Amino acid sequence: MKRSVHSRNWKDVVNKYCLLLLVFILSSCSKDEETPLPEQPGSGVSSFNFTALKVNDVFNGYSYYGLNDKPVFKVSFSNPIDRTSVPVSVKLSDATGQAIPVSISYLQGDSTLSATPITALKPLGKYFFDVQTNIKSTAGKYLSAPITVNFITALDPGDKFPRLSDEQLLDLVQKQTFKYFWDFGHPVSGMARERNTAGNTVTTGGTGFGVMAIVTAVNRDFITRQQGAARVRQIVDFLKKADRYHGAFSHWMDGNSGETIPFSLKDNGGDLVETALLMQGLLTAKQYFNAENATEKSIAKDIQALYESVEWDWYTKNGNSLFWHWSPEYQWDMNLPIKGWNEALITYVLAAASPMHSISKSVYDQGWAGNGAIRNGNTYFNQVLPLGSSSGGPLFFAQYSFLGLNPNGLKDAYADYGTQVKSHALIQYEYAKANPKAYYGYGENCWGLTASDDINGYLTHEINNDNGVVSPTAALSSFPYTPAESMKALRFFYYQLGDKIWGKYGFTDAFSLHHAWFADSTLAIDQGPMIIMIENYRSQLLWKLFMSNQEVKTGLRKLGFSSPNI
């Protein structure tokens, strides 16, 4: 019993000491938790805030366009700033992350800092101005959140090249752009490469444009008639051996073999619209190369044979519309009827004009015009648009079919085509002047939206799908419709932007002053219309040649068109 009492007393002592030890430990932990930790930048603990931002004394959000070369950034805070923290927390950098020295001054008792680059920034450069969270107040507090301003500097308005007369400038643009088709033409086939990086991929419609460019070049004495005829002869010989599908060519071909290169999975056969654009060019060349010599006679004969072999009527599927594609592997799976309004009017004209495989007027009325559904009639930017979608769509709709077809005085039951194409171009011009999306650079000198290369690949640019990218071909291929407006654009593109977009094949495909982005690419389907339509503006050469073809006249009359040229 004594043993048990003694044991109990010992346990009480131990428990007492354990309890005291536990109280000590807990009290120690409590004291540690109450000790303030060092403040972390931007943690929100005892932080301070920025209260105002101005760029050149204006606040317009956190993105700016067209800034001068020494912009002033003023940032105001809720507390005075510790100046020693500024060098590591306030930064100006370019798009590569390279730091740019800035001059700092302080206002309002150090609660506002003003920063400006020490040296002038480059024109059309992308830059970032940052105030990071490691900036401190004089009370030792850190900024609660970072500030980032992205901006693009303004265009240098000075001329990049010596001034020329307008006629000299037009000569230069045509001659330089022609090099795409002449110097860069495929060495085996003579066909136009799809783009400047295309290798052996040649384009059917683009070659039609290239053939019309060759005619222009001969007429302008850029090359001799013999040289031009030889190149057309080379192209025709290649086409005679190339893959065809009921007479129609594929969109793309291998420039060595003539074999089809699929444009997409099921688009690996005949493309009727591309074929029509090719034939427009070939028939123009046939009218031009008409001398009584063996070479030019053979060119005319073989072009006629190629045209007559196209089974336009077969591409109706025995119905009342032409269809865009047919594939020997996928048959009619693409199932894309050719219906207006778009670039494909020439397809129906040449189909109706065919001496061997003609279509009826009902195919045109129902398939293309939708029995009148093609009409628009609405007004956009004070311009009445007879046909098509809202605001007209991309400008190539007003250009591709009218490289050969003269729209002036051309009318049918649905539209006056001279009005259609001029209104479409003027709508885009007026849109750029109004600039409802406030894209930097847009205006009377910088306009034109069409399908082209884009910042993120390729895009069909138009008023309803505008991301600030301008394509020179849009305004310059509108020369016959808007000569004064197109000349303004040409002067601007060449003199003010020439250091960015002028190269060995003329103007590059697209640019955006708003995003300080400039394509380095050139495409056959964009280079060709510029040469051709500038020539139609200057002399109507291609219009006169194409419209002089008797089969074209017959086809137009068959579809119900009237024109002083038929």
Task: Please name every model-derived segment.
Residues 156-566:
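Ser/Thr/Asn(+Pro)-rich, low-complexity disordered segments
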Residues 14, 38-41, 108-111, 208-219:
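Structured core of small recognition/catalytic domains
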Residues 33-158:
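Acidic, low-complexity Ser/Thr/Gly/Pro-rich repeat segments typical of extracellular/periplasmic
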